[in-house]
Amino acid sequence: FAEKPQYISNSYVDDFTSKNLNLKWTFIRVPQNKTYSLNVNPGYLRLYPKPNTIENRKNFSLIGFRQKESDFDYEVKMNYKPSDESVESGIIHYQKERNFLTSTIYKAGKKIFLEQRLKEKDQKLVSLKKVSLKKYNGSIIFKTVSRKDEYTFYYSLDDGENFTYLSSLD
């Protein structure tokens, strides 16, 4: 028994139909008024952008949950139509303000891009991968698969029918 791996069911799905945000969701700092809404579009979490970024250690727009296992599969669907080149949206694998990985959608000119960036302690933020999303229609599913300390990242532009490999990190 001792040599067998032990697993806890940490499966979690949130369809955002409750009037209140589930307590499994967390914020980096104390949530400010009008940070998010569950009422604007029932069944969806609406996150409002803030002018701050992760690096400046101020309150930025982030709602997340803690990673509880080293082996997991994670998917999140995001609806986002960038209209302003100064705003981006996506997911973040966050350890601290000085150590994180982002996968975000943004607009540059008339093109839409998915870019993955890595920030490590005492290092500058670097772009790992940048992909032009020619078939982006305002909806994307981000997928992360973690096995034995290796993270593999995918995305889908067809509601999860097909996933495209983005990158891997260990």
Descriptions of predicted regions:
Residues 1-170:
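Extracellular glycan-recognition regions
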